[in-house]
Amino acid sequence: MFAKIALVGRPNVGKSTLFNRLIRSNRAITHDMPGVTRDRMEGIVRGRNKRPFGIIDTGGITLDGHAAVAEGPAGIRGFEAEILRQAEEAIAECVAVCLVVDGREGLLPFDEHLASYLRRTGKPVLVVVNKVDGIEKEDVLTAEFHILGFPVLAVSAEHGHNLRWLESEMRDLLPEEDEDGIDDDAADATAVAIADADAETEDGASASETEEDITEETVEDEPEAPLRLCMLGRPNAGKSSLVNALTGTNRMIVSDVAGTTRDSVDVAFEKDGLSYTFVDTAGVRRRSRITDTVERYSVNSSLKSTTKAHVTLLVLDAVEGITSQDKRLIELLDERKTPFMVLVNKMDLVPAKAREDGKRNFRDLLNFCQHVPLLFVSAKTGYELRSIVPLAARIRRECSVRIPTGQLNRAMEEVITRHQPPVVRRVRPKFYYMTQAESQPPTFVLFVNDADRIQAPYAKYIEKSLRRLFGIEHAPMRVHFRSSHKKNSEK
Protein backbone atom coordinates (compact mmCIF):
# COMPACT_ATOMS: atom_id res chain seq x y z
CA MET A 1 0.00 0.00 0.00
CA PHE A 2 1.36 3.40 -0.93
CA ALA A 3 1.78 6.26 1.53
CA LYS A 4 -0.99 8.75 2.35
CA ILE A 5 -1.09 12.40 3.41
CA ALA A 6 -4.00 13.95 5.34
CA LEU A 7 -5.53 17.38 4.70
CA VAL A 8 -6.52 18.88 8.08
CA GLY A 9 -7.86 22.29 9.06
CA ARG A 10 -10.75 24.46 10.17
CA PRO A 11 -14.04 24.47 8.22
CA ASN A 12 -14.17 26.42 4.96
CA VAL A 13 -10.43 26.88 4.47
CA GLY A 14 -10.66 25.06 1.12
CA LYS A 15 -9.57 21.50 1.94
CA SER A 16 -12.14 19.84 -0.33
CA THR A 17 -11.39 22.19 -3.23
CA LEU A 18 -7.71 21.39 -2.77
CA PHE A 19 -8.52 17.66 -2.61
CA ASN A 20 -10.47 17.84 -5.89
CA ARG A 21 -7.66 19.78 -7.56
CA LEU A 22 -4.98 17.33 -6.47
CA ILE A 23 -6.85 14.20 -7.58
CA ARG A 24 -8.12 15.99 -10.73
CA SER A 25 -11.75 15.08 -10.10
CA ASN A 26 -14.83 16.64 -8.49
CA ARG A 27 -15.49 13.94 -5.92
CA ALA A 28 -15.75 16.07 -2.79
CA ILE A 29 -18.70 18.47 -2.54
CA THR A 30 -17.53 22.07 -2.15
CA HIS A 31 -19.54 25.08 -1.01
CA ASP A 32 -19.06 28.43 0.70
CA MET A 33 -21.05 27.16 3.68
CA PRO A 34 -18.73 25.92 6.47
CA GLY A 35 -18.80 22.27 7.55
CA VAL A 36 -19.86 20.68 4.25
CA THR A 37 -17.34 17.81 4.55
CA ARG A 38 -17.93 15.44 7.46
CA ASP A 39 -16.73 11.94 6.64
CA ARG A 40 -13.20 11.58 5.35
CA MET A 41 -12.64 10.90 1.66
CA GLU A 42 -9.65 9.27 -0.02
CA GLY A 43 -8.10 9.78 -3.44
CA ILE A 44 -4.88 9.29 -5.40
CA VAL A 45 -2.54 12.02 -6.61
CA ARG A 46 -0.85 11.04 -9.87
CA GLY A 47 1.63 12.68 -12.20
CA ARG A 48 3.42 11.71 -15.37
CA ASN A 49 6.48 9.68 -14.36
CA LYS A 50 5.85 10.78 -10.76
CA ARG A 51 5.34 8.68 -7.69
CA PRO A 52 1.61 8.37 -6.86
CA PHE A 53 0.43 8.83 -3.29
CA GLY A 54 -2.87 8.88 -1.42
CA ILE A 55 -4.53 11.88 0.18
CA ILE A 56 -7.35 12.01 2.71
CA ASP A 57 -9.78 14.93 2.88
CA THR A 58 -11.11 15.37 6.43
CA GLY A 59 -13.99 17.38 7.84
CA GLY A 60 -13.39 20.82 9.26
CA ILE A 61 -12.34 20.59 12.91
CA THR A 62 -14.24 23.13 14.95
CA LEU A 63 -15.74 23.74 18.38
CA ASP A 64 -19.43 23.79 19.21
CA GLY A 65 -21.11 26.35 21.45
CA HIS A 66 -20.27 24.42 24.63
CA ALA A 67 -16.50 24.72 24.25
CA ALA A 68 -14.15 27.68 24.45
CA VAL A 69 -11.71 28.37 21.65
CA ALA A 70 -8.82 28.26 24.10
CA GLU A 71 -9.51 24.59 24.87
CA GLY A 72 -8.41 23.51 21.40
CA PRO A 73 -9.15 19.94 20.21
CA ALA A 74 -9.62 18.66 23.77
CA GLY A 75 -12.62 20.96 24.15
CA ILE A 76 -14.64 19.58 21.27
CA ARG A 77 -18.08 18.25 22.20
CA GLY A 78 -21.02 16.57 20.50
CA PHE A 79 -21.29 16.11 16.75
CA GLU A 80 -17.98 17.87 16.06
CA ALA A 81 -16.21 15.27 18.21
CA GLU A 82 -17.09 12.65 15.59
CA ILE A 83 -15.49 14.78 12.88
CA LEU A 84 -12.35 15.07 15.03
CA ARG A 85 -12.33 11.29 15.56
CA GLN A 86 -12.45 10.81 11.79
CA ALA A 87 -9.54 13.23 11.39
CA GLU A 88 -7.54 11.45 14.11
CA GLU A 89 -8.00 8.11 12.35
CA ALA A 90 -6.94 9.67 9.05
CA ILE A 91 -3.81 11.14 10.64
CA ALA A 92 -2.96 7.75 12.16
CA GLU A 93 -3.11 6.17 8.68
CA CYS A 94 -0.93 8.86 7.09
CA VAL A 95 2.81 9.45 6.96
CA ALA A 96 2.40 13.25 6.94
CA VAL A 97 -0.17 16.03 7.35
CA CYS A 98 -0.99 19.20 5.45
CA LEU A 99 -2.44 21.80 7.82
CA VAL A 100 -4.64 23.91 5.53
CA VAL A 101 -5.27 27.50 6.65
CA ASP A 102 -7.00 30.54 5.15
CA GLY A 103 -4.58 33.25 3.99
CA ARG A 104 -7.35 35.85 3.73
CA GLU A 105 -8.51 35.39 7.32
CA GLY A 106 -4.97 35.15 8.68
CA LEU A 107 -3.74 33.13 11.65
CA LEU A 108 -6.54 32.37 14.12
CA PRO A 109 -6.21 30.90 17.64
CA PHE A 110 -7.67 27.61 16.56
CA ASP A 111 -5.06 27.26 13.80
CA GLU A 112 -2.45 27.48 16.56
CA HIS A 113 -4.23 24.85 18.65
CA LEU A 114 -4.40 22.52 15.66
CA ALA A 115 -0.70 23.06 14.98
CA SER A 116 0.14 22.16 18.59
CA TYR A 117 -2.10 19.11 18.36
CA LEU A 118 -0.42 17.95 15.12
CA ARG A 119 3.05 18.52 16.59
CA ARG A 120 2.25 15.96 19.31
CA THR A 121 1.50 13.31 16.67
CA GLY A 122 5.13 13.31 15.56
CA LYS A 123 4.12 13.34 11.88
CA PRO A 124 5.77 15.72 9.37
CA VAL A 125 3.53 18.78 8.86
CA LEU A 126 3.33 21.23 5.96
CA VAL A 127 1.30 24.42 6.48
CA VAL A 128 -0.65 25.11 3.27
CA VAL A 129 -1.84 28.73 3.19
CA ASN A 130 -4.80 28.61 0.82
CA LYS A 131 -6.63 31.43 -0.97
CA VAL A 132 -3.42 33.27 -1.93
CA ASP A 133 -4.21 34.28 -5.50
CA GLY A 134 -0.80 35.46 -6.71
CA ILE A 135 2.92 35.56 -6.02
CA GLU A 136 2.75 39.26 -5.19
CA LYS A 137 0.56 38.47 -2.14
CA GLU A 138 2.54 35.52 -0.81
CA ASP A 139 4.91 37.30 1.59
CA VAL A 140 2.18 39.44 3.14
CA LEU A 141 -0.39 36.67 3.59
CA THR A 142 1.99 33.94 4.79
CA ALA A 143 4.28 35.88 7.15
CA GLU A 144 2.37 35.27 10.39
CA PHE A 145 2.00 31.51 9.75
CA HIS A 146 5.75 30.94 10.15
CA ILE A 147 5.22 31.27 13.91
CA LEU A 148 3.67 27.79 13.85
CA GLY A 149 7.14 26.32 13.34
CA PHE A 150 6.38 24.25 10.22
CA PRO A 151 7.31 24.73 6.55
CA VAL A 152 4.84 27.10 4.86
CA LEU A 153 3.61 27.12 1.25
CA ALA A 154 1.11 29.55 -0.29
CA VAL A 155 -1.40 28.19 -2.82
CA SER A 156 -4.77 28.92 -4.38
CA ALA A 157 -6.88 25.81 -4.81
CA GLU A 158 -9.49 27.79 -6.71
CA HIS A 159 -7.11 29.33 -9.26
CA GLY A 160 -4.41 26.64 -9.31
CA HIS A 161 -1.60 28.85 -8.00
CA ASN A 162 1.45 26.81 -6.84
CA LEU A 163 -0.38 23.45 -6.99
CA ARG A 164 2.46 21.72 -8.84
CA TRP A 165 4.86 23.01 -6.25
CA LEU A 166 2.53 21.70 -3.54
CA GLU A 167 2.51 18.23 -5.14
CA SER A 168 6.29 18.27 -5.18
CA GLU A 169 6.46 19.32 -1.52
CA MET A 170 3.98 16.60 -0.56
CA ARG A 171 6.07 13.96 -2.33
CA ASP A 172 9.09 15.17 -0.36
CA LEU A 173 7.15 14.33 2.83
CA LEU A 174 6.87 10.66 1.85
CA PRO A 175 9.25 8.20 3.54
CA GLU A 176 12.33 7.44 1.47
CA GLU A 177 12.17 3.73 2.23
CA ASP A 178 8.86 3.50 0.34
CA GLU A 179 10.36 4.88 -2.88
CA ASP A 180 10.84 1.66 -4.81
CA GLY A 181 9.58 2.68 -8.21
CA ILE A 182 5.87 2.32 -7.60
CA ASP A 183 4.14 3.21 -10.84
CA ASP A 184 0.54 4.09 -11.66
CA ASP A 185 -0.38 0.50 -12.50
CA ALA A 186 0.85 -0.74 -9.14
CA ALA A 187 -1.03 2.01 -7.37
CA ASP A 188 -4.20 1.05 -9.20
CA ALA A 189 -3.76 -2.58 -8.19
CA THR A 190 -3.41 -1.74 -4.50
CA ALA A 191 -6.18 0.84 -4.36
CA VAL A 192 -8.64 -0.03 -7.11
CA ALA A 193 -11.56 1.02 -4.92
CA ILE A 194 -10.25 4.57 -4.60
CA ALA A 195 -9.17 4.66 -8.23
CA ASP A 196 -12.66 3.72 -9.42
CA ALA A 197 -14.15 6.55 -7.40
CA ASP A 198 -11.57 9.02 -8.68
CA ALA A 199 -12.71 8.26 -12.22
CA GLU A 200 -16.08 9.95 -11.53
CA THR A 201 -16.40 13.36 -13.18
CA GLU A 202 -19.00 16.06 -13.35
CA ASP A 203 -20.41 14.70 -16.62
CA GLY A 204 -21.39 11.35 -15.07
CA ALA A 205 -24.81 9.75 -15.57
CA SER A 206 -27.76 11.72 -14.22
CA ALA A 207 -31.31 10.84 -13.37
CA SER A 208 -32.56 12.24 -16.68
CA GLU A 209 -30.51 9.90 -18.91
CA THR A 210 -32.11 7.14 -20.91
CA GLU A 211 -31.91 3.49 -19.93
CA GLU A 212 -29.52 2.75 -22.79
CA ASP A 213 -27.14 5.57 -21.82
CA ILE A 214 -27.04 4.44 -18.23
CA THR A 215 -26.43 0.83 -19.21
CA GLU A 216 -23.40 1.87 -21.24
CA GLU A 217 -21.93 3.78 -18.31
CA THR A 218 -22.39 1.17 -15.61
CA VAL A 219 -19.61 -1.07 -14.35
CA GLU A 220 -17.97 -3.21 -17.00
CA ASP A 221 -17.75 -6.98 -16.75
CA GLU A 222 -14.53 -7.35 -14.73
CA PRO A 223 -14.74 -10.43 -12.50
CA GLU A 224 -11.42 -9.65 -10.79
CA ALA A 225 -12.44 -6.16 -9.67
CA PRO A 226 -13.56 -5.83 -6.04
CA LEU A 227 -17.31 -5.94 -5.55
CA ARG A 228 -18.56 -2.34 -5.35
CA LEU A 229 -21.76 -1.80 -3.34
CA CYS A 230 -23.64 1.52 -3.19
CA MET A 231 -25.80 2.38 -0.18
CA LEU A 232 -28.89 4.39 -1.17
CA GLY A 233 -31.95 5.54 0.73
CA ARG A 234 -33.75 8.34 2.51
CA PRO A 235 -31.99 10.35 5.24
CA ASN A 236 -31.61 8.57 8.58
CA ALA A 237 -32.52 5.11 7.24
CA GLY A 238 -29.29 3.74 8.73
CA LYS A 239 -26.99 3.57 5.71
CA SER A 240 -23.86 4.69 7.56
CA SER A 241 -24.65 2.41 10.51
CA LEU A 242 -24.88 -0.52 8.10
CA VAL A 243 -21.53 0.35 6.51
CA ASN A 244 -19.91 0.50 9.94
CA ALA A 245 -21.50 -2.78 11.03
CA LEU A 246 -20.62 -4.62 7.82
CA THR A 247 -17.00 -3.44 7.79
CA GLY A 248 -16.50 -3.75 11.55
CA THR A 249 -15.27 -0.15 11.79
CA ASN A 250 -16.48 3.31 12.79
CA ARG A 251 -15.54 4.64 9.37
CA MET A 252 -18.72 6.69 8.91
CA ILE A 253 -20.09 9.36 11.25
CA VAL A 254 -23.42 8.23 12.67
CA SER A 255 -25.98 10.42 14.44
CA ASP A 256 -29.72 10.77 14.87
CA VAL A 257 -29.61 13.95 12.77
CA ALA A 258 -30.98 13.29 9.29
CA GLY A 259 -28.53 14.20 6.54
CA THR A 260 -25.34 13.51 8.50
CA THR A 261 -23.61 12.04 5.42
CA ARG A 262 -23.12 14.50 2.55
CA ASP A 263 -20.38 13.19 0.27
CA SER A 264 -20.42 9.78 -1.40
CA VAL A 265 -17.67 8.04 0.56
CA ASP A 266 -15.79 4.86 -0.42
CA VAL A 267 -15.07 2.38 2.37
CA ALA A 268 -12.85 -0.54 1.32
CA PHE A 269 -12.62 -3.75 3.37
CA GLU A 270 -11.65 -7.40 3.08
CA LYS A 271 -13.55 -10.51 4.05
CA ASP A 272 -12.50 -14.14 3.58
CA GLY A 273 -9.59 -13.01 1.43
CA LEU A 274 -11.77 -11.00 -0.96
CA SER A 275 -11.86 -7.22 -1.38
CA TYR A 276 -15.05 -5.15 -1.33
CA THR A 277 -15.96 -1.47 -1.42
CA PHE A 278 -19.03 0.14 0.12
CA VAL A 279 -20.08 3.55 -1.19
CA ASP A 280 -22.02 5.36 1.53
CA THR A 281 -24.17 8.14 0.10
CA ALA A 282 -26.22 11.08 1.31
CA GLY A 283 -29.91 10.53 2.00
CA VAL A 284 -32.23 11.17 -0.94
CA ARG A 285 -35.35 13.24 -0.30
CA ARG A 286 -38.02 14.54 -2.64
CA ARG A 287 -36.89 17.54 -4.67
CA SER A 288 -39.61 19.69 -3.15
CA ARG A 289 -38.07 19.17 0.31
CA ILE A 290 -34.51 20.00 -0.71
CA THR A 291 -33.92 23.51 0.57
CA ASP A 292 -30.19 24.12 0.14
CA THR A 293 -27.60 23.75 -2.59
CA VAL A 294 -25.37 21.38 -0.61
CA GLU A 295 -28.16 18.84 -0.24
CA ARG A 296 -28.95 19.11 -3.94
CA TYR A 297 -25.32 18.33 -4.78
CA SER A 298 -25.37 15.46 -2.29
CA VAL A 299 -28.49 13.90 -3.80
CA ASN A 300 -27.09 14.14 -7.33
CA SER A 301 -23.88 12.49 -6.14
CA SER A 302 -25.88 9.70 -4.47
CA LEU A 303 -27.85 8.88 -7.62
CA LYS A 304 -24.72 9.06 -9.76
CA SER A 305 -22.99 6.57 -7.44
CA THR A 306 -25.54 3.87 -8.34
CA THR A 307 -24.27 3.90 -11.94
CA LYS A 308 -20.71 3.28 -10.74
CA ALA A 309 -21.53 0.32 -8.49
CA HIS A 310 -21.98 -3.36 -9.26
CA VAL A 311 -24.99 -3.60 -6.92
CA THR A 312 -27.04 -0.92 -5.12
CA LEU A 313 -28.32 -1.60 -1.60
CA LEU A 314 -31.54 0.38 -1.09
CA VAL A 315 -32.03 0.90 2.65
CA LEU A 316 -35.54 1.32 4.08
CA ASP A 317 -36.67 2.06 7.63
CA ALA A 318 -38.59 -0.86 9.17
CA VAL A 319 -40.39 1.44 11.62
CA GLU A 320 -41.56 4.01 9.06
CA GLY A 321 -42.39 1.45 6.37
CA ILE A 322 -42.29 2.18 2.65
CA THR A 323 -42.83 5.88 2.00
CA SER A 324 -43.71 7.53 -1.30
CA GLN A 325 -40.05 8.52 -1.72
CA ASP A 326 -38.97 4.90 -1.18
CA LYS A 327 -41.38 3.84 -3.92
CA ARG A 328 -39.99 6.47 -6.28
CA LEU A 329 -36.43 5.27 -5.66
CA ILE A 330 -37.45 1.64 -6.25
CA GLU A 331 -39.25 2.58 -9.46
CA LEU A 332 -36.25 4.64 -10.61
CA LEU A 333 -33.80 1.76 -10.04
CA ASP A 334 -36.18 -0.71 -11.67
CA GLU A 335 -36.73 1.50 -14.74
CA ARG A 336 -32.98 2.01 -15.15
CA LYS A 337 -32.40 -1.73 -14.77
CA THR A 338 -29.96 -1.06 -11.96
CA PRO A 339 -28.89 -4.22 -10.09
CA PHE A 340 -30.20 -3.69 -6.57
CA MET A 341 -31.54 -5.30 -3.43
CA VAL A 342 -33.72 -3.88 -0.66
CA LEU A 343 -32.54 -3.86 2.96
CA VAL A 344 -35.21 -3.17 5.56
CA ASN A 345 -33.12 -1.85 8.46
CA LYS A 346 -33.92 -1.29 12.17
CA MET A 347 -35.81 -4.56 12.59
CA ASP A 348 -34.68 -4.49 16.23
CA LEU A 349 -37.09 -1.58 16.79
CA VAL A 350 -40.12 -3.51 15.51
CA PRO A 351 -42.06 -5.34 18.25
CA ALA A 352 -41.72 -9.13 17.94
CA LYS A 353 -45.48 -9.62 17.49
CA ALA A 354 -45.62 -7.16 14.59
CA ARG A 355 -42.60 -8.43 12.65
CA GLU A 356 -44.29 -11.07 10.51
CA ASP A 357 -47.11 -8.72 9.52
CA GLY A 358 -44.55 -6.03 8.77
CA LYS A 359 -42.52 -8.35 6.56
CA ARG A 360 -45.67 -9.39 4.71
CA ASN A 361 -46.58 -5.75 4.07
CA PHE A 362 -43.14 -5.00 2.63
CA ARG A 363 -43.34 -8.04 0.33
CA ASP A 364 -46.81 -7.04 -0.89
CA LEU A 365 -45.73 -3.47 -1.62
CA LEU A 366 -42.69 -4.70 -3.60
CA ASN A 367 -44.68 -7.20 -5.62
CA PHE A 368 -44.27 -5.14 -8.80
CA CYS A 369 -40.54 -6.00 -8.98
CA GLN A 370 -40.47 -9.59 -7.79
CA HIS A 371 -36.89 -10.30 -8.89
CA VAL A 372 -35.46 -7.82 -6.36
CA PRO A 373 -34.20 -9.52 -3.14
CA LEU A 374 -35.69 -8.28 0.12
CA LEU A 375 -33.70 -8.69 3.34
CA PHE A 376 -34.79 -7.70 6.85
CA VAL A 377 -31.73 -6.61 8.83
CA SER A 378 -30.51 -4.67 11.85
CA ALA A 379 -27.29 -2.69 11.86
CA LYS A 380 -27.50 -2.45 15.65
CA THR A 381 -27.82 -6.16 16.47
CA GLY A 382 -26.19 -7.61 13.34
CA TYR A 383 -29.35 -9.51 12.40
CA GLU A 384 -29.02 -11.06 8.90
CA LEU A 385 -26.04 -8.85 7.98
CA ARG A 386 -23.99 -11.88 6.94
CA SER A 387 -26.43 -12.53 4.06
CA ILE A 388 -25.90 -9.16 2.34
CA VAL A 389 -22.50 -9.51 0.66
CA PRO A 390 -22.98 -13.10 -0.65
CA LEU A 391 -26.35 -12.14 -2.13
CA ALA A 392 -24.89 -9.00 -3.73
CA ALA A 393 -22.07 -11.10 -5.21
CA ARG A 394 -24.66 -13.46 -6.69
CA ILE A 395 -26.52 -10.55 -8.32
CA ARG A 396 -23.26 -9.38 -9.85
CA ARG A 397 -22.58 -12.85 -11.28
CA GLU A 398 -26.08 -13.03 -12.74
CA CYS A 399 -25.58 -9.65 -14.44
CA SER A 400 -22.53 -11.08 -16.24
CA VAL A 401 -24.32 -14.14 -17.65
CA ARG A 402 -23.71 -14.86 -21.36
CA ILE A 403 -25.85 -17.52 -23.06
CA PRO A 404 -24.94 -19.02 -26.47
CA THR A 405 -27.45 -18.30 -29.24
CA GLY A 406 -28.06 -21.99 -29.94
CA GLN A 407 -28.93 -22.66 -26.31
CA LEU A 408 -31.20 -19.64 -26.25
CA ASN A 409 -33.15 -20.75 -29.32
CA ARG A 410 -33.64 -24.28 -28.00
CA ALA A 411 -34.99 -22.73 -24.82
CA MET A 412 -37.25 -20.38 -26.80
CA GLU A 413 -38.72 -23.31 -28.70
CA GLU A 414 -39.49 -25.11 -25.45
CA VAL A 415 -41.05 -22.00 -23.87
CA ILE A 416 -43.26 -21.22 -26.88
CA THR A 417 -44.34 -24.84 -27.27
CA ARG A 418 -45.45 -24.92 -23.67
CA HIS A 419 -47.49 -21.74 -23.99
CA GLN A 420 -48.32 -20.28 -27.42
CA PRO A 421 -48.69 -16.48 -27.72
CA PRO A 422 -52.34 -15.40 -27.85
CA VAL A 423 -53.98 -14.46 -31.13
CA VAL A 424 -54.08 -10.69 -31.63
CA ARG A 425 -56.29 -9.19 -34.35
CA ARG A 426 -56.85 -12.69 -35.80
CA VAL A 427 -53.12 -13.33 -36.18
CA ARG A 428 -50.90 -15.35 -33.86
CA PRO A 429 -47.37 -13.88 -33.49
CA LYS A 430 -44.67 -16.08 -34.98
CA PHE A 431 -41.21 -16.26 -33.40
CA TYR A 432 -38.10 -16.68 -35.58
CA TYR A 433 -35.08 -16.62 -33.30
CA MET A 434 -33.60 -15.04 -30.18
CA THR A 435 -30.15 -13.68 -29.31
CA GLN A 436 -28.48 -12.05 -26.32
CA ALA A 437 -27.52 -8.51 -27.27
CA GLU A 438 -25.49 -7.69 -24.17
CA SER A 439 -24.92 -8.28 -20.48
CA GLN A 440 -24.86 -5.75 -17.61
CA PRO A 441 -27.77 -6.34 -17.44
CA PRO A 442 -28.65 -9.41 -19.55
CA THR A 443 -30.51 -8.14 -22.62
CA PHE A 444 -32.33 -10.45 -25.04
CA VAL A 445 -33.82 -9.68 -28.45
CA LEU A 446 -36.55 -11.89 -29.96
CA PHE A 447 -37.32 -11.54 -33.66
CA VAL A 448 -40.99 -12.04 -34.55
CA ASN A 449 -43.23 -11.42 -37.54
CA ASP A 450 -44.95 -8.47 -35.81
CA ALA A 451 -43.65 -7.15 -32.49
CA ASP A 452 -46.77 -5.01 -32.04
CA ARG A 453 -48.81 -8.16 -31.46
CA ILE A 454 -46.79 -9.23 -28.39
CA GLN A 455 -48.86 -8.30 -25.36
CA ALA A 456 -47.41 -7.37 -21.96
CA PRO A 457 -48.53 -10.55 -20.11
CA TYR A 458 -46.85 -12.75 -22.71
CA ALA A 459 -43.68 -10.64 -22.60
CA LYS A 460 -43.67 -11.17 -18.83
CA TYR A 461 -44.08 -14.91 -19.37
CA ILE A 462 -41.01 -14.92 -21.66
CA GLU A 463 -38.95 -13.04 -19.07
CA LYS A 464 -39.97 -15.36 -16.23
CA SER A 465 -39.15 -18.39 -18.36
CA LEU A 466 -35.69 -17.05 -19.19
CA ARG A 467 -35.03 -16.40 -15.52
CA ARG A 468 -36.10 -19.92 -14.56
CA LEU A 469 -34.18 -21.72 -17.31
CA PHE A 470 -30.90 -19.83 -16.91
CA GLY A 471 -30.84 -19.11 -13.19
CA ILE A 472 -31.15 -15.34 -13.48
CA GLU A 473 -33.18 -14.90 -10.32
CA HIS A 474 -32.28 -11.44 -9.03
CA ALA A 475 -30.46 -9.52 -11.77
CA PRO A 476 -32.41 -6.98 -13.85
CA MET A 477 -33.26 -8.13 -17.36
CA ARG A 478 -34.33 -6.54 -20.63
CA VAL A 479 -36.40 -8.43 -23.21
CA HIS A 480 -36.98 -6.69 -26.56
CA PHE A 481 -39.26 -7.88 -29.37
CA ARG A 482 -38.25 -6.84 -32.86
CA SER A 483 -40.25 -7.23 -36.07
CA SER A 484 -38.30 -9.03 -38.77
CA HIS A 485 -39.87 -6.81 -41.46
CA LYS A 486 -40.07 -3.53 -39.47
CA LYS A 487 -36.74 -1.89 -38.93
CA ASN A 488 -36.09 -0.55 -35.44
CA SER A 489 -39.52 -1.57 -34.15
CA GLU A 490 -39.15 -2.60 -30.50
CA LYS A 491 -41.46 -3.23 -27.67
UniProtKB/Swiss-Prot annotation:
Residues that bind GTP 2: 233-240, 280-284, 345-348
One of the record's GO molecular function terms: ribosome binding
Protein name: GTPase Der
Binding site for GTP 1: 9-16, 57-61, 130-133
Superkingdom, natural source: Bacteria
Organism from which the protein derives: Nitratidesulfovibrio vulgaris (strain ATCC 29579 / DSM 644 / CCUG 34227 / NCIMB 8303 / VKM B-1760 / Hildenborough)
Subunit structure of this chain's protein: Associates with the 50S ribosomal subunit.
Family, per entry: Belongs to the TRAFAC class TrmE-Era-EngA-EngB-Septin-like GTPase superfamily. EngA (Der) GTPase family.
GO BP: ribosome biogenesis
Pfam families: KH_dom-like, MMR_HSR1
InterPro entries recorded: G_ENGA, GTP-bd, GTPase_Der, KH_dom-like, KH_dom-like_a/b, P-loop_NTPase, Small_GTP-bd
PANTHER family: GTPASE DER
Domain spans labelled KH-like: 401-485
Domain (EngA-type G) ranges: 3-178, 227-400
Keywords assigned: GTP-binding, Nucleotide-binding, Repeat, Ribosome biogenesis
CDD domains, per database record: EngA1, EngA2
Region spans: Disordered: 198-225
Chain intervals with Acidic residues compositional bias: 198-224
Role, per record: GTPase that plays an essential role in the late steps of ribosome biogenesis.
